[in-house]
């Protein structure tokens, strides 16, 4: 394993630990999830370029699109929670009703 792969894997697990540790506020959880998705994007891009798998070259782009959609939905939830409750605690997510 190259040092770049080790660093990216470590970045993924540090972001995962951030999700588990800082799960009280939605903003910090969303930032850690974005870190996880970006490290997965870079690892997947490096894996595809290293093994010359041209058949799955669209996979990193699809992952990036889903990451952007996840960020948009998360920020919409953050705005809705902030306007309703005045804070961004994750425990308020189960209180949101249509």
Curated annotation (Swiss-Prot):
Where are its TM segments located?
1-21, 28-48, 59-79
Q: What is its EC number?
A: 7.1.1.2
Q: Does the keyword Ligase apply?
A: no
- What keywords would UniProt list here? Electron transport, Membrane, Mitochondrion, Mitochondrion inner membrane, NAD, Respiratory chain, Translocase, Transmembrane, Transmembrane helix, Transport, Ubiquinone
Compartment(s): Mitochondrion inner membrane
MF GO annotations: NADH dehydrogenase (ubiquinone) activity
Q: Please describe what this protein does.
A: Core subunit of the mitochondrial membrane respiratory chain NADH dehydrogenase (Complex I) which catalyzes electron transfer from NADH through the respiratory chain, using ubiquinone as an electron acceptor. Part of the enzyme membrane arm which is embedded in the lipid bilayer and involved in proton translocation.
Tell me the protein's name: NADH-ubiquinone oxidoreductase chain 4L
Its lineage reads: Eukaryota, Metazoa, Chordata, Craniata, Vertebrata
Source gene?
Answer: MT-ND4L
